[in-house]
Amino acid sequence: MKITFDTKSFLFDGQRRLILSGDVHYFRIPKAEWKDVLLQAKQAGLNAISTYVPWNVHEPVENKWCFEEEADLEGFLKLAKQLDLLVIAKPGPFIRTDWSFGGFPNWLHAAGVRHFRTSDGTYMAAVDKYLDKMLGVLARNQSLKGGPIFLVQIEDAFDLVPQDPAYLRHLENKFKKKLQIPVYFNLADPSSGGGFVKGALLGVNLDKEAGQSLKRVRELAGTHRQPLMVSGLLTARAEYWNDRSERASRTWPEVENVLNEAVAQGAALVNLTPFAGGSNFGEMAGRGLSGDRSFAAISWDGGAPLSELGVKTPKALGLGLWSRWARTLESSLLGSERINEDHPVIPSELSVVAREQGDTRIYFLHNPTSETLNGKIQVDEALHFTLAPGERRAYAFNLGVTPNLSARACTHPYFVEHLGTRSVIVLWGEPGQKLHFYGSGTLDVVSRSSDQILVEHERKGFVLSAEFSNRAQRLLAKVMFEAGQREVLFLIVTRHLAEQSSFDPAKGRLVLGSSEVDFSRKMARLEPGSRTLISVEEATLAEDYFTAVAPEAKVVKAQPAGLLEETALLKRAEARTDWAPFSVGKDLAEQGYHTDRVWVRLRFNAAQAGKKHLIFPGLEDQAAAFHKGQFLGLVGRLGTGLDLDLPVKAGVNELLLALHAFGRYSEGSKLGEKKGLLLPVFDGGEVQNFADGWHFLEAAGPLDFQIFSAPTFSGRGWELGALPKTLERSGYVCARKKFKVPDWAKRVRLNLHAGDVRVQVAINGELAGTHPDARGAQFQEFEITPHLIKDPKAENTMALFFKGPTRGFEHCELLFLGPELKAEIDACPGYYAADETEALKDKNWAKTGKGRWGFWRAQFKTPPLKDVAAAVLTLPKHGRGVLWLNGHNLGKHWKDGVGEGMKLPLSWLKPANDLLVLEEEAGLPHEASVTFHPKFNEEKLP
């Protein structure tokens, strides 16, 4: 199949097609579920799916490629082809999808890569090797070779980072050399004007507002002939442990409004991001940008149209209806031109976009006000409507719906399906609303109906009128016409029932809810110009999808199978003989550890017995600390703090750390940040966490950091109080704090946790740093150099100058550091870091007991899976750690999570199951239960 494009659309062997796509990530979905998910995509009206291709999934270890199980990319592509779904492939090399390290493999650190997403030679050498392999896979499955891939994305949202034109040109040349199908750049913020190669095909991400972004993309495209592409229409927000700031998902009306605006502006491709939810299994959950404790949850759902559990949400049902409407108007949407004449629409407060193709006109209306508006639009017929605040709606006039029938106008949306020699027109509305369909031509009526329907013949054709029933479980109206040799069936149903419709053109089947529509009929002939009121017997659905009672879910309580707490684990670690030197400042991967969990041992001398206060400013991300077999607590950014009190003896002391790199940044300037012990451990120090006690001042005009010492500004005095996280102020806000540097301090560091808040930091009137920095850092570490400090014995002033809202600012901390701890540091993997099967073989499992840190094991049995739709694990007493099920790494768990449970893939379950929990925070033992949700009202998928 040959793919071309022009300014209106993509053409497939010369035929225009409106592309409705959605993200379905094969690597986030168990392979056994792929077919069901893709079928659901088709049921929702999609004719394409989009997927990222993560480098770290396919080459987790350098030169060792993985294409098995959930990494079976070609198997996924072949399945899409079998189901007649097109594919948009997004192989990166960077991917922006809440995935660990942006899809980069950890071993790039060991390969010497330091500058990611740039034209740096070391980075590009690794990228070229990856693309040679992966683009070869995609090339074998491109449309010209009979595969499903018709479009490929280069990189991802590069407009959000500092520009490197040489890097983008190199990638574009590489992609075009390997592929014979269109490639494009995706823009997250087209207002920046960067992120692409001039003349390249462009796509854009959309959230709630589409107009300005689409206009800007057209400007960037310039004279280059290309269709308008929405490469990412946001339908959901990823969920993050301990961070609910982005949990507000998009509702279906919000998504529908953006869809309507996109096609009104002429979009020929719309990709929903995402369509299907999934899971961040294993170590692949990315770290977010909203503070130290922001990590992607196991569940990658956030309100996707098809949930992580495979359940259709109202978004999927609404999308199915909208996509059928769009297909009915497809040729008119793609072939039309925008017209700018005065529009026959009142009131004037409405925003109107009109498109025209031949005699067909489509009017897209938008109510931008905060009030409900009643209006009228008149082309040939007068249509009255009501639009809620912010609502968008489209009306088509003179639209050909079958070879012998045109719709002059209609008060309600509809779609058309062709089943052999029969055409079905489904019209939907809310109970109590009145429908008027104005058709062309004189038709013979063949009727079977459940309520009164008025059919009037007139000079221009006929008018069909009805009222939508408030009886949701009944088929409201079914009227059949004959137009020449073709039967035309009108179904007038509630929106809920229309959302449940499915069609099988090959078999001539139409299903509403769970009932197949009966096409048997009685003939009743209408004379031209007659006025007929049709009232026949009711046609009741066999089952109402919305009111039937679902079978009760089965809850199975897992039976405890033992503890392997810290004492046993420590003994095993201390007895190991494979300890090796551990380097401060190097990533775990640089030191040969292909895991995020290792044992680290510090040996140091103390001149005398007593207590040491150690500071760990560079520990990423947390470590359980042990001394003389005792659990001292968690240290690090995810622990109780960066410092630790340690009782020591005179002579050699040993501190054992179970270091856990909890997740790698998925984007931003911290992408590529190393994991491990990145700075020395300091012998003595103080951490001042400035979360309250701020002096702050508000100003309406420009604020310069030099004015921090002024007692007043613009007549406003300094105010004393906490700096709220949700403080919203216009203009500028300045906050200041006094501090003294202890005599013993050797170094002073400032850690600023400010999300994406724009802020300048000044020390004693001199600029110390800017946040975010040039690369968009969300967390900044500043070394406070000696020249910024006054006389060490004097009081110093730190000032923060916020430009705009301060929402997202968490806190800042000053670290006063003593001398570096003179320590011998070594490490070993231990089975704490290896796979969990070694832990299960341990002979030191205790049947009962308590522990502060360690493994907890439980077992449970599975009911017959043929009756199970989904399984969900609940851990009511858990804290933070890692989960395994039957040898599969489910991912990380956290008590501050987002949701009531965690998905257990059915394909990973056995009749008897082993659940293993690594607990690092809440203590042991645990409790666990699994809820098995039964299959209920499954769709009759064609």
Regions found by a protein language model. Give the residues of each.
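Carbohydrate-binding surfaces of carbohydrate-active enzymes
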Residues: M124-Q153, D159, D164-L168, E172, ...
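Aromatic- and glycine-enriched glycan-recognition loops and surfaces
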Residues: Y26-Q43, E62-L79, T251-E254, Q608-L614, ...
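Exposed low-complexity, polar/acidic, P/S/T/G-rich flexible segments that act as propeptides
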Residues: Y665-A700, T806-D835, P925-P942
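Short beta-strands within extracellular/lumenal beta-sheet-rich domains
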Residues: H594-N605, R729-K740, K850-P863, E900-M902
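Short strand-turn-strand beta-turns centered on an Asx-Gly dipeptide
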Residues: D13, D380, F626-L632, A762-G769, ...
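Extended substrate-binding grooves/exosites of carbohydrate-active enzymes
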Residues: M1-K35, L39-Q43, H58-K64, E69-K78, ...
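Aromatic-lined ligand-binding clefts that engage carbohydrates, nucleic acids, or primary amines
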Residues: G610-H627, L655, W718, F739-G765, ...
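Short, surface-exposed tryptophan/glycine-enriched loops
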Residues: W322, L642-V652, Q778-E795, F860-L865, ...
